[in-house]
Amino acid sequence: MLAPTPLPIQVGPATVTMNHNDRFVVCQPDGRIVDTAAEGFFARDTRFVAGWELLVNGRRPVLLNSSPIQYFSSRFEFTNGKLTDDAGPLEPQSLSIRLDRTVWGGVHEDYTLANFGRRAVRLTIEIEINSDFADLFEVKSGEIVRRGAINSRWFRSRRELRTTYVNAAFRRELILQVDRADSPPQFANGKLVFIAKIEPKRAWRTCLRWLPITEGGRRPQTLPCHSIAAAPPEMSEVRLPLVRLEASNPTVVRAWDQAVRDLESLRLEDTTAARGVIIPAAGVPWFVTLFGRDSLVVSIQTMSGHPEFAVGALRRLARLQATEDDPERDMEPGKIPHEVRHGELAKLGILPFTPYYGTHDATSLFVIVLSHLFHWLGDVDVLRRYLPNVEAAMAWIDRWGDRDDDGLQEYKTRSSHGYYNQAWKDAGDAIQHADGTLAPLPLAVCELQGYAYDAKVRLADIYDRLDRPRDARRLRSQAARLFDQVNEQLWWEEEGTYYLGLDGSKKPIKSVASNAGHLLFSGIVPPERAGRVVARLMADDLWSGWGIRTLSSEHPGYNPFSYHTGTVWPHDNAIVAAGFHRYGFHAEAARIARATFDAAERFQANRLPELFAGLVREESTFPVQYLGANVPQAWAAGCVIQLVSMLAGIDARSDADGSRIYVDPALPDWLPELSIANLRAGRGQVSLRISNGNVETTSNTTGFEVVRGPAPALG
């Protein structure tokens, strides 16, 4: 008897998400918004709508189906169950009730109720919308404190309900406007009420707009009626051409296409001024704002053909780079910010997030991204433009990054509201000793050393391009000393990997974690040790089958559902895979890539979430969702681009002799051929076809030479 063929599996969060710019809606599959859940309509870190419900003759309609249509729109289809009007019972399933919802500036809703019964019906349609104006941080924690006053007023002539929130200098307002309706609206008992008389085979319609009023007091524009499937309006004057992928593996193509859509959907409008200036929000729902680390990681992930993310990140973060010392914001001169917030807690100074600087790695990553961008643009002017910023960043690395002047990078918050951990694993319990106890501050986490090393190597290369050989030699000397120190003090011989770091007493943190893979990515691992590190990271206690866990399953602090102590993060795995590839471990890198694409295939829309559970993979099953994961999320999307570029072996180098795109493919048997069109570099675009180890350039307007082979090492 033949074994049954497994059914296609697609899992995902039990909510519907729509987003555009810094506005988003998270709701139930039936469109409801539950005020006790982490749901609502949010704009600039404030929840403007905390509850929504539709009633027809006092009953909830019966959900038939719902689905996102575009990243900013969804449709909800209902019918009626048992329902009675003044003429008696209605036939079950005789009503079609449709809700279309779009997010763009505000929210636009189209309601259509069609009568397919044999008689006319009289319906009381009630739409309940309530607001709490809660700060996003408190919605996330579930500990909401109302500090200001809420007032609502119905303006009958304007057909709008205005709800205002005021707390000292912080003011927000929601305008609920009836845009058009086939019967006049009323406002009673906290609900919009319509009386609809619908003849057989006729329909009743209304449109509502939710208008959030933030700083400046202007009413935002929403999309017009019936726009759920429309091509999205442009946020910038010139639309960038899509970088297209064709491949023999359809799963990879679907994951790529969704990743590109996610990155497009996460663009922040206030930083998107023109062609080539794009910064993605970090993720929906919790990180719909500018994050230093996230925007820079996405820049690195997508550099092979998507340099506009790096252009936007450097431009915006350079403007926010610290120039003074403010302990409450963990701010020191030269430091790159962690995040910028606009909600009540930030605006009134309750949280120091305007912006907050409590991240260590973003400052090194800023230098690294500039180096990558130069090599992909071939424009020395970009180095001159940002040289003061990267020199200030390096000064921070040397003074503030190394707080005790021992040669290693460490962090310790100085803020009363600061983050305990300030590397990418920034959950409070992320860095534990072997017995599960928290490692005391300050912490010299291992990957920070790799980032600082890479930043020094790359700044030396920048100095070479600017004809400053003395400074280049100085940075290379510093990098060499850090290389030796890391490999002397952080190497863990018994485990064949690196310590997670050193704690505040310089005691090694003997916990096996994914962090060591970032050292391979940074190039700070001696070649003779690389094989042992790769083998340790691929051992069963770290390898789940869907990817490498953040922490060994043998560690007492391991929990497959914990944010940073046992889950699998796609972006973490892509960085580790790129490190494997850098040292020539192509099979192991491809294994991580295959597992990541297998996971994407099993998530809704082939969309990778921020993270998922570290449970062991079993045959014909699926990766388990992490409760509260951001979906879409920028560096989860970016990892798809990074993995494809890694397998294709694409990189760029620019020097005094010219600029070149190097292509050194190591395609696995599950991806024997691919074509990438419209990779952006230099002055134009390049399209490549890779098959059976052969590389064909099908078009090239970049001004770069395409070279078959690996890119030379820097320095």
Where in this protein do the model-derived segments appear?
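Hydrophobic or amphipathic alpha-helical targeting/insertion segments
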Residues: D110-F116, A120-R122, V369-V382, E391-W396
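Terminal accessory carbohydrate-recognition/targeting modules of carbohydrate-active enzymes
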Residues: M1-S265, T272-S295, I300-V311, R315, ...
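Inter-helical turn/loop segments and adjacent helix faces that build the functional surface
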Residues: L370-R385, K456-R474, F580-A587
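TPR repeat positional signature
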Residues: T363, V367-L370, Q449, K456, ...
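Extended glycan-interaction surfaces of carbohydrate-active proteins
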Residues: E77-K82, E246-L290, R315-Y357, D402-A444, ...
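Alpha-helical support elements that line or immediately flank enzyme active sites
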Residues: D294-D325, N515-P527, N573-A589, A593-T596
